Amino acid sequence: MEVNQLGFIATALFVLVPSVFLIILYVQTESQQKSS
């Protein structure tokens, strides 16, 4: 099976970007709860 490099990069970005965004939101809410 030949993997299309551009398709692989697009899939990786499609998965990684929302994951990083959710992690950042989670860390921000966690730090706010601890400080208050």
UniProtKB/Swiss-Prot annotation:
GO terms for cellular component: photosystem II; plasma membrane-derived thylakoid membrane. It comes from the Bacteria. InterPro entries: PSII_PsbM (IPR007826), PSII_PsbM_sf (IPR037269). It is a single-pass membrane protein. GO terms for biological process: photosynthesis, light reaction. PSII binds multiple chlorophylls, carotenoids and specific lipids. Coiled coil: none annotated. HAMAP family: PSII_PsbM (MF_00438). One of the components of the core complex of photosystem II (PSII). PSII is a light-driven water:plastoquinone oxidoreductase that uses light energy to abstract electrons from H(2)O, generating O(2) and a proton gradient subsequently used for ATP formation. It consists of a core antenna complex that captures photons, and an electron transfer chain that converts photonic excitation into a charge separation. This subunit is found at the monomer-monomer interface. Belongs to the PsbM family. This is Photosystem II reaction center protein M. It comes from Thermostichus vulcanus.
